[in-house]
């Protein structure tokens, strides 16, 4: 139901290979709990019209937060994955306790008067870094400048169930599992992150580092990366390559492309060249769909043809790039994905 939103009892029985009495019993139970609701009727083919049923989007909500070096991004999401409120506030990250208190206050203000407290399942917090979820520790975050940083103070300050996730992993969670059960997510933000799922589940690796595509060597001996190595994909494919480390906005850069600025067009063409190499390598290694997300992913939909042509030039085994997908959320993907964790958890407990 979370994937389809609206369906019928007969379709559920067919999809799940269940008997109609079993489906009726479970659907009626969920209708009684107000998780589901009747949404209308199907056109009659003779006899009584079948009722359509769907998720009651207002049954519960979850909040998502993305923490960056200079901002926090907040969203409130309903059970239909719809963003019903969002805000982005400038707040410089510090490792001090006062930061946790300030975030908690911003959350309280954001939620004030929005919904009944008992419908809020929890807060998902997306962080750019490697996270030990069991111990509630950020093992390392170059973006925030922290190492072995405890998240328990922030958890206590929020006073609501909290889930912590790497920002790229969270963005992957924002995508529908049914649509992309096996996929790579390239998070083309200020820094380059990544994630991938297998059979609808995030693959984390032995040390929580799976999907760190930004630190694969793309150009041996090339540009210096913030991690200390040279030639990392991040130094060639992150949004910062286009924004000159935030000296200009991505929107301003794209406007210059539209106006035909030759220098900007050259930078963009080189960027797509390097991105095409990275995509080709990932496709050869994983043989799955590749979702283009993050700030740059949000604007790539208008440039899929030139990007696809460059990718095909590096891949002699395939003659199309239908595996390249645009992200579902051009903005707020990490915050939404972190929030959606609570829907999956809650539905599993019903």
Regions found by a protein language model. Give the residues of each.
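Glycine-rich phosphate-binding loop and adjoining helix at the ATP-binding site
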Residues: 87-182, 302-314
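Adenine-nucleotide phosphate-binding core of ATP-dependent small-molecule kinases
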Residues: 98-116, 233-236, 243-303, 326-334
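Glycine/GP-enriched mid-protein hinge/lid loop-to-helix segment characteristic of carbohydrate kinases
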Residues: 86-88, 152-153, 159-258, 262
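Conserved phosphate-binding catalytic cores of ATP/NTP-utilizing and phosphoryl-transfer enzymes
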Residues: 38-62, 162-185
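Hydrophobic "anchor" residues
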Residues: 83, 137-138, 202-203
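Gly/Thr-rich phosphate-binding beta-strand-loop-beta motif of the actin/hexokinase/Hsp70
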Residues: 47-86, 185-198
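Glycine-rich phosphate-binding/hydrolytic loop that grips phosphoryl groups
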Residues: 2, 163-178, 302-350
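Nucleotide/phosphate-binding catalytic cleft detector across ATP-hydrolyzing
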Residues: 1-49, 53, 348-350
């Amino acid at each position: 139901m979370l994937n389809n939103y609206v369906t019928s009892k007969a379709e559920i029985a067919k999809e799940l290979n269940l008997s109609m009495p079993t489906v009726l019993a479970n659907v009626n139970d969920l209708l009684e709990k107000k998780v589901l609701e009747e949404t209308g009727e199907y056109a009659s083919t003779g006899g009584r019209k079948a009722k359509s049923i769907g998720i009651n989007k207002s049954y519960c909500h979850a909040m998502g937060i993305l923490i960056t070096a200079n901002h926090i991004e907040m969203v409130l999401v309903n059970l239909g994955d719809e963003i019903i409120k969002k805000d982005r506030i400038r707040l410089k990250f510090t490792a001090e306790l006062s930061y946790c208190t300030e975030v908690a206050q911003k959350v309280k203000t954001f939620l004030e008067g929005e919904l009944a407290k008992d419908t809020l399942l929890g807060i998902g917090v997306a962080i750019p870094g490697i996270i030990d979820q069991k111990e509630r520790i950020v093992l390392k975050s170059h973006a925030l400048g922290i190492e072995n940083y405890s998240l328990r103070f922030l958890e206590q300050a929020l006073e609501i169930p909290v889930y912590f996730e790497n920002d790229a992993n969270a963005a992957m969670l924002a995508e529908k599992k049914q649509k992309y059960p096996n996929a790579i997510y390239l998070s083309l933000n200020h820094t380059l992150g990544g994630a991938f799922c297998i059979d609808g589940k995030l693959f984390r690796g032995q040390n929580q580092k799976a999907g760190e595509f930004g630190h694969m060597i793309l150009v041996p001996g090339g540009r210096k990366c913030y991690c200390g190595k040279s030639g990392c994909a991040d130094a060639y494919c992150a949004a910062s390559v286009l924004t000159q480390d935030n000296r200009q906005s991505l929107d301003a850069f794209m406007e210059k492309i539209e106006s035909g600025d030759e220098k900007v067009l050259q930078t963009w063409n080189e960027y797509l060249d390097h991105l095409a190499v990275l995509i080709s390598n990932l496709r050869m290694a994983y043989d799955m769909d590749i979702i283009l997300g993050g700030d740059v992913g949000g604007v790539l939909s208008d440039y899929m043809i030139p990007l696809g042509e460059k990718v095909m030039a590096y891949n002699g085994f395939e003659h199309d790039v239908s595996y390249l997908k645009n992200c579902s959320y051009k903005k707020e993907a990490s915050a939404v994905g972190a929030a959606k964790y609570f829907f999956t958890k809650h539905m599993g407990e019903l």
